[in-house]
């Protein structure tokens, strides 16, 4: 591994990786479109949940610091629709949840345009650590 190339790459804005960013946005927005149209599948939710976790991690790192309420409301909305979907097999949004998740998606897009590759790596580590430490709020509570 070339340490200098790694340092330079880590300072590169994610937005400079056009193909990656476009693919990510298409995947996220298609999942959101399916959710808003009442056609979301578990796979769509499996796309939106990591997106929301990533928004929260970047928020904690200072990207979108002014959007605390929007991040919290968006996470709550995703949790609620996910929980209902796990119970009845259909992922149907309520209007307030749709607004909250659209705002969360807009914040995610703005964060992706503002961060570097190194920031992305740090956010992934935060999400991974939260998962390993079981600090993430589960959609479905496990009963023992």
Enumerate the predicted regions with their spans.
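Short, flexible domain-boundary/linker segments around small modular repeats
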Residues: 4-39, 66-92, 133-140
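Extended intrinsically disordered, low-complexity coil regions enriched in Ser, Thr, Gly, Ala
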Residues: 47-81, 110-125
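Amphipathic alpha-helical binding modules
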Residues: 90-144
């Amino acid at each position: 591994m070339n340490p200098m190339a790694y340092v330079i790459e880590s300072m590169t804005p994610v937005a400079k990786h056009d193909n990656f960013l476009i693919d990510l946005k298409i995947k996220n927005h298609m999942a959101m479109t399916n959710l808003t149209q009442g056609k979301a599948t578990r796979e769509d939710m499996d796309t939106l949940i990591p997106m929301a976790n990533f928004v929260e991690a970047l928020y904690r790192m200072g990207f979108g610091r002014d959007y605390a309420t929007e991040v919290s409301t968006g996470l709550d909305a995703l949790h609620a629709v996910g929980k209902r979907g796990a119970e009845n097999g259909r992922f149907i949004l309520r209007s307030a949840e749709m607004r909250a998740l659209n705002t969360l998606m807009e914040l995610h897009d703005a964060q992706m345009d503002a961060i570097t590759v190194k920031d992305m790596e740090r956010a992934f580590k935060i999400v991974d650590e939260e998962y390993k430490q079981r600090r993430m709020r589960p959609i479905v509570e496990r009963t023992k």
